[in-house]
């Protein structure tokens, strides 16, 4: 399943993995997973975090290494995003709940994830998804972007 991933996808997943792997030791712990999820406005219990790790922890050592992370991502991609997952993701970005993702909201979420982006990079991300050219991303544009990746 992992062999169906492109080099570009693997590189993107490596970048995502390093956002989770705060101490850079090559493993994601429940603590690191919790930190990232809380920065995205989620509030998982310790048991839920452990369950998430156990789901993909092939060698049973209690953490997720990059090959396990890749397997999980490949599985998730094969099991394409449900509308519910996309709606939840949209809500994470749409902080004020007005139905649009502004550049400021996008920057806020990316910064919480530890991703420092320049104004140009944020504007570029908005432009790529902003089909109607109003300078922000509405739900339909967000769905198109999520399904086209």
From Swiss-Prot:
InterPro entries for the chain: CALM/Myosin/TropC-like, EF-hand-dom_pair, EF_Hand_1_Ca_BS, EF_hand_dom
GO MF annotation terms: calcium ion binding
Keyword field contains ATP-binding: no
UniProt KW keywords: Calcium, Metal-binding, Methylation, Repeat
PROSITE patterns in UniProt: EF_HAND_1 (PS00018), EF_HAND_2 (PS50222)
Gene Ontology CC terms: myosin II complex
Transferase in keyword set: no
Residues where N6,N6,N6-trimethyllysine is found: 116
Protein residues bound to Ca(2+) 4: 130, 132, 134, 136, 141
Residues that coordinate or bind Ca(2+) 1: 21, 23, 25, 27, 32
Residues noted as binding Ca(2+) 3 in the record, renumbered to the chain: 94, 96, 98, 105
Domain of life: Eukaryota
Residues that hold Ca(2+) 2 according to the record: 57, 59, 61, 63, 68
Domain EF-hand, residue spans: 8-43, 44-79, 81-116, 117-149
Coiled coil, from the record: none
Any further remark recorded for this protein: This protein has four functional calcium-binding sites.
Purpose: Calmodulin mediates the control of a large number of enzymes, ion channels and other proteins by Ca(2+). Among the enzymes to be stimulated by the calmodulin-Ca(2+) complex are a number of protein kinases and phosphatases.
Protein family: Belongs to the calmodulin family.
PANTHER family reported in the protein's UniProt record: CALMODULIN LIKE 3, MYOSIN LIGHT CHAIN 1, 3
UniProt name for this protein: Calmodulin
Species whose genome carries this gene: Physarum polycephalum
Species classification: Eukaryota, Amoebozoa, Evosea, Eumycetozoa, Myxogastria
């Amino acid at each position: 399943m992992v062999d169906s991933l492109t080099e570009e996808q693997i590189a993107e997943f490596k970048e995502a993995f390093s956002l989770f792997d705060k101490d850079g030791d090559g493993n994601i712990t429940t603590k690191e997973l919790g930190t990232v999820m809380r920065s995205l406005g989620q509030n998982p219990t310790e048991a839920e975090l452990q369950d998430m790790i156990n789901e993909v922890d092939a060698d049973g050592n209690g953490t997720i290494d990059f090959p396990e992370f890749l397997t999980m991502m490949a599985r998730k991609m094969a099991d394409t995003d449900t509308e519910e997952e996309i709606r939840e993701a949209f809500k994470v970005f749409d902080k004020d709940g007005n139905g649009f993702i502004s550049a400021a909201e996008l920057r806020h979420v990316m910064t919480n994830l530890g991703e420092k982006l320049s104004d140009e990079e944020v504007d570029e991300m908005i432009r790529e998804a902003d089909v109607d050219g109003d300078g922000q991303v509405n739900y339909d544009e967000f769905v198109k972007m999520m399904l086209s990746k």
